[in-house]
């Protein structure tokens, strides 16, 4: 099974629920970078991870795939080839979980949010406006776009970014992403990476959701000497 990466093109925080969960209004798209999964029924769940981005991906119960299988009441052996960079905000874990739900023919998009906030979008895929805490998916017409991804060597905690957003009083982001000022506050080194990326490509870089991935529209020419340590990935949007 193919599990495409997702990219958050824009994100507005529209409120905070009484339980502390943040409400969003975001545009998300699927990319042509994808993990590959082989899933077979088994008496207990096991996960094997290989591929260029396998390092750091857990194979125990902390892997979100376990939660997806528990939701649909199944156990399986899951072999994952990780082609999506880990920890950069591209939905690598969520899309693997969504692939498992598709394999199990689980179609309750709202319930899939109990596995993870990005799982509902990954279950639907394509291009969509995503609202609520991620469980409301409003499909949008597909738009073909070429995108250059810049993945710095830093892991960003999404909860930490939302906590920073709260502490800052709920700032609005100038670039269509309300989490960008919060991410830059929580992880000041992200600003240096943004500056280096914009210098290298001579155009604006946008933060993907809470980060740490930055992106630029188009397949950009760049001065790679300015981007030591940054993974540069050329991607395109894909239909669901």
What are these regions (language model features)?
Residues 2, 10-26, 107-205, 217-240:
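ATP-dependent small-molecule kinase catalytic core of the GHMP/sugar-kinase superfamily
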Residues 65-68, 101, 187, 214-218:
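Short, hydrophobic beta-strand segments that form beta-sheet elements in well-ordered domains
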Residues 92-93, 207-212:
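Glycine-rich beta-strand-to-loop/alpha-helix junction loops that act as flexible
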Residues 1-88, 106, 133, 151:
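ATP-binding N-lobe of GHMP and related small-molecule kinases
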Residues 85-87, 120, 212-215:
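Short, active-site-adjacent cap segments at secondary-structure transitions
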Residues 88-109, 113:
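DPxDG-like acidic metal-binding loop motif
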């Amino acid at each position: 099974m193919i599990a495409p990466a997702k990219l958050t093109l824009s994100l507005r925080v529209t409120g905070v629920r009484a339980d502390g969960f943040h409400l969003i209004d975001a545009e998300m798209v699927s990319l042509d970078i994808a993990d590959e999964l082989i899933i077979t029924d088994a008496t207990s769940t096991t996960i094997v991870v290989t591929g260029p981005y396998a390092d750091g991906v857990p194979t125990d119960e902390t892997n979100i795939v376990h939660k997806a299988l528990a939701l649909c009441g199944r156990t399986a052996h899951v072999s994952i080839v990780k082609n999506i960079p880990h920890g950069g905000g591209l939905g690598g874990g969520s899309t693997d979980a969504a692939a498992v739900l598709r394999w199990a023919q689980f179609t309750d998009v709202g319930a899939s949010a109990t596995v993870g906030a990005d799982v509902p979008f990954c279950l639907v895929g394509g291009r969509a406006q995503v609202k609520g805490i991620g469980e409301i998916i409003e499909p949008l017409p597909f738009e073909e776009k070429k995108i250059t991804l810049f993945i710095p060597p830093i892991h960003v905690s999404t909860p930490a970014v939302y906590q920073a957003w709260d502490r800052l009083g709920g700032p609005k982001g100038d670039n269509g992403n309300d989490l960008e000022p919060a991410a830059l506050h929580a992880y000041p080194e992200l600003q240096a990476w943004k500056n280096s990326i914009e210098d290298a490509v001579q155009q604006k870089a946008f933060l993907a959701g809470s980060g740490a991935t930055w992106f630029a529209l188009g397949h950009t020419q760049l001065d790679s000497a300015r981007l030591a340590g940054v993974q540069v990935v050329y991607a395109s949007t894909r239909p669901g």
